[in-house]
Design a protein with these regions (language model features):
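Pre-Walker A adenine-sensing motif
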Residues: 3-18
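Hydrophobic anchor at the beta1->P-loop junction of P-loop NTPases
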Residues: 25
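Walker A/P-loop
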Residues: 34
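Short glycine-rich substrate-engagement loop in P-loop NTPases that contacts/grips substrate
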Residues: 55-84
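Interdomain motor-coupling "hinge/lid" segment immediately C-terminal to the ATP-binding subdomain
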Residues: 120-122, 127-229, 265
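Accessory nucleic acid-recognition modules appended to NTPase machines
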Residues: 182-342
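Domain-level recognition of nuclease-like catalytic cores that cleave nucleotide substrates
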Residues: 381-403
């Protein structure tokens, strides 16, 4: 299967190409950052940029292991700079180089160097890095394949959208899994290896965690409660009741590590009436539902929250800041905020064919009295648009592919 095009992320790189600003792509391991660089470099070569003008270093590869010292990295790059040419510098998985920002800052001030970097966790853009490069970089968050990208990859398969959705949430949306569609054990091994790398290599090593089983128990608890309101106290109490004694501070620390690894997303609650954030229990969502399938195989028992997770990730892909909407009575699944403060409200339900279910799902949206757009996303087939007092019901698969 050829490389999967990632038009949204490619467009980001194209927009900022040759601008005096550092391009930063962050995202969980194996979500496609290296492939994105390869696709963009192919475009550069097609646009008459020569191979000598491209310096590409992937710090996950053994051949570049010696460049994890920032001084050696500086020398390596400096030797390859052609002063009379425009140079394109790609630093992939830069978090492996302590003090890398000193190298980036040095080459940034040279007019003929266009810089692109990636990292696989939230902390590689540390406060020191952000301070040094303030105003000098633009950042985009990269996620695994969207449902639309997944459907496009299977465009010649003849499979229905519904079948592809089931594959998408059960088999996983990491690009590397597309080559293993018929190999169940291969997919399991790939996901287990990726999970071990993210959890054991990134989180355990960075936080110096001794009790790996406790960390795994916390992950399982979160996965079993996707889309539910939880906090460290609730997790600690549940694990302690099950015989795993743990305090709130430890759970909080482990949760922060899981978020920093980009495996989990903490979604804060938003007071719809007062238009402000609340310091209440958040909800958590996972970067790919296949991780839940890996640890908790009976995914069908929680189809509603699985769909909710898919919608949450898609809203993030589209550039929204996403919150849980808190009402005086009840809540709205998602309050999505665009840059500039414009809001949209989303309720997600597998089906609202039953009138009682439909009324229950519409009620939170009807309670909102402002004029921002309101959407009800369901799996129900719609042969014509449905509108309930300004609330637009959409087929969620249509919405996911942008129809």
């Amino acid at each position: 299967m050829p490389l999967v095009s990632r038009p949204y992320y490619l467009d980001f790189l194209r927009r900022h190409k040759d601008r005096p600003i550092i391009k930063v792509v962050s995202g969980i391991r194996r979500c496609g950052k290296s492939t994105l660089f390869k696709l963009f470099q192919d475009e550069l070569l097609a646009d008459n940029v020569t191979v000598e003008q491209i310096i590409d270093i992937n710090f996950e590869l053994m051949e570049y292991d010696k460049l994890r010292d920032y001084r050696a990295l500086y020398e390596y790059i400096n030797e390859r700079i052609i002063p009379s040419k425009k140079m394109y510098l790609f630093l992939d998985e830069i978090q492996h180089v302590p003090s890398f920002e000193r190298v980036v800052d040095n080459f940034f001030v040279q007019d003929n160097i266009d810089i692109y970097i990636t990292g696989s966790n939230a902390y590689f853009m540390s406060s020191d890095m952000a301070t040094l490069l303030t105003g000098r970089y633009v950042q985009i968050e990269m996620l695994p394949l969207s449902y639309k990208e997944y459907v496009d990859a299977y465009s010649e398969s003849g499979l229905s959208r519904m079948v592809l959705y089931e594959k998408y949430v059960s088999e996983g949306s990491f690009p590397g899994l597309l080559h293993m569609s018929e190999n169940w054990q291969g997919r399991q091994d790939y996901l287990q290896g990726l999970f071990n790398t993210v959890v054991l290599k990134d989180i355990v090593d960075r936080l110096k965690i001794a009790d790996i089983k406790l960390l795994e128990s916390i992950v399982r608890y979160i996965f079993a409660n996707i889309g539910s309101l939880i906090n460290p106290t609730k997790i600690a109490n549940s694990l302690t009741s099950a015989g795993r004694k743990v305090d709130n501070k430890t759970v909080e620390r482990y949760l922060r590590g899981l978020e920093d690894s980009l495996l989990l997303y903490n979604t804060e609650r938003f007071d719809v009436r007062g238009k402000e954030l609340l310091r209440l229990r958040p909800k958590y969502y996972v970067v790919d539902m296949a991780f839940k399938q890996l640890l908790l195989p009976d995914i069908n028992r929680d189809r509603g929250h699985v769909l909710e997770n898919v919608v949450y990730l898609e809203l993030r892909r589209r550039g929204y800041t996403v919150y849980v909407g808190q009402l005086t009575k009840g809540e709205i699944d998602f309050v999505a905020q665009k840059p500039g403060g414009i809001l949209e409200y989303y309720q997600v339900s597998e089906s609202v064919l039953d009138p009682t279910t439909r009324d229950r799902e519409l009620a939170p949206l009807e309670a909102v009295k402002d004029q921002y757009p309101k959407f009800l996303l369901t799996m129900d087939e719609l042969y014509k648009p449905h509108n309930y007092n300004g609330i637009q019901q959409c087929n969620v698969l249509d919405w996911l592919i942008g129809m």
